[in-house]
Every structure is written in structure tokens, then in C-alpha cells.
Amino acid sequence: MRKIFTPLACSLLIGISLTACSNENPQTTDTTFQLNSSILPTRAPQLNANGGGTFSKNDENTLLFQAPQGTLVKSFTYTYGKTYYWNELNLPSSHKELQVSGCYPTITTSTPTLFAWDVRNASVTADLLLAPPVSVTPNTTPDIRLQFNHAMHQLQIELKADGTTLQQAACSQAKLTCRNFLPIANVNLLQGAVISASGDKSSLQATGDKATFILPPQAAGNLQLQVQLSGREYTFDLATHQIAGSPITLLESGKSIKLTITVSKTSFSVTGQNIGAWESQGESNGSIIL
């Protein structure tokens, strides 16, 4: 199983600047558009410790141009560092106004309103950034600004030895398992949103004192966390823990829950269940005995 390290927060702002080249002949007028992007805490290229950063040359986004009624007109792969012109898109002249949504990494699909994103797919990152649609007028709108956010949920686990009966080095041998989650996020790329989660109940495992599991948004339901350490194991239901006095019932899109578990030779004490900087969802406390 893979161990995923994903920085804490998520919000990506993209500005598409369109600059018209002056020409008296409208048939030869070319209008360029350019993505000027920044990533405020997220998972993508060149990030700092808090998840902020920028896309780099040759990184790619998928832009989805759609009619106001929500039907796909054109899917377009934008590569950072290149210059593009509106007329390269070959958009139908009948559409005077369009909407544009986006995703990162790039996606090619014939069913953009129902795309299956499987977090177990080892060939791509488990994380997915989506931008809901904004309105544009081709060759008129000077700036298109897309707000990208994490579509998945981030569940972080951290073990901390008590330092008396157990040293931190011992925690590096722990096996951390997240199980009974639904692995497939059903995504509407045109809306830039996750519709539901589906698939057979699945597990992901990591070794060490820290792990991050990227999961589709879903009900906490039967989701379990298992800690195996020093020949012992403990399994607990996520839904039995609380955040600010309320049970954890839902793993929300774009949010992160962090469980900080203090470990001794006789017990685990869940001292922090806190929502980190993707966007905070909560923190919980409890104890588990080996």
C-alpha cells in the first residue's frame, strides 16, 4: 500500500489573462490567453511546508468550456509556459457566452458529468483539484479567474510516544491502516464537484509514525483506523470520536482531519483530532488500550 504525504491546505487561484492584439481586420485579430496561477495550500508542484506554491513550466490543467445550460463545448489542455489564442479553441460562434471549469491533473473523458476518480489508482496522485465554472465571453473577457480546491478529504494520523515507557523511534515501526472506505469519487467535472462515493469497501496501509490518507468525501459510517505496534493492535471506529463535542459523521470535500495519538506501552491516547489547513473540520480526543 502507498504512503501519501499531502500538504495541509487547499485553494488554487488561476487568472487567465486575455490580451487583444490591435488589428483593424477582425478576421486576423488574435486574442491570447494565459494562465497566471498560484497555489494557496494544496498538493501540486513546488509547494512550501504549508502547501502554498505555484505551478511550473510544462504543468498542465484541463479547462472545460461549456454552454450556459451545462453541456460540454470544448475540453482543452493548457500547458504552462505556452501561449494560446482564443481562435485555437475553435469554439462555435453561436456561443456568445460560455462557462469554464477546470481540473488538475489533466483528465480526458467522454462523460464529464460522471467521472470516476479512484484514489487507489497508483498511476496518478490520489489528490484532485477542481474549479467550479465561471462565466466568460470569448474574445471579450479580459481575465478568467478559477478557484481550485481539493476535491477529496485528507485524513492524517500521527503517533507520538509518551517518551517514558516508549520512545519515538519505536513508533516508526507502526503499521497504520485506514479501512472500510468507499474508494471511488463520482465527479461532475463541469460543476467542479464530487457527487457521491462508491465502490467496494477498501483499505490503505502505511508504515511509520505518520500517514496521510486521501479519501473520497463520504459518510464516516463504518470507516475504521487500525494501529499495529510492538506486536499489538487496536482498531477503532472513526464515527465514535468527536469534534467539538459532535460525532464525526462525514468526511468533507476539501477538508482535513488530523488524529494525533499519544502512545505508551499500555495505551494509545488520542490527544488531537484536528482539522488542518486544507480547511479545518475538527479535532477529537480519546484513548485506546493495547
Which residue stretches match the model-derived regions?
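Surface-exposed loop/edge segments in extracytoplasmic proteins
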Residues: Q69-T77, Q167, L182-L190, S196, ...
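Hydrophilic extracytoplasmic domains
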Residues: Q242-L290
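C-terminal motif of bacterial Sec signal peptides marking the signal peptidase cleavage site
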Residues: S17-A20
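Edge beta-strands of extracellular beta-sandwich domains
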Residues: T111-W117, E233-Q242
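Short, surface-exposed alpha-helix to beta-strand junction/turn motifs within ectodomains of secreted
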Residues: S172-I184
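Bacterial N-terminal signal peptides that target proteins for export
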Residues: M1-A9
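Short, low-hydrophobicity acidic/polar segments
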Residues: N23-A170, T177, D200-K201, Q205-A211, ...
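Short, surface-exposed linear segments at secondary-structure transitions and domain or protein termini
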Residues: K82-E88, V194-D200, Q242-K258
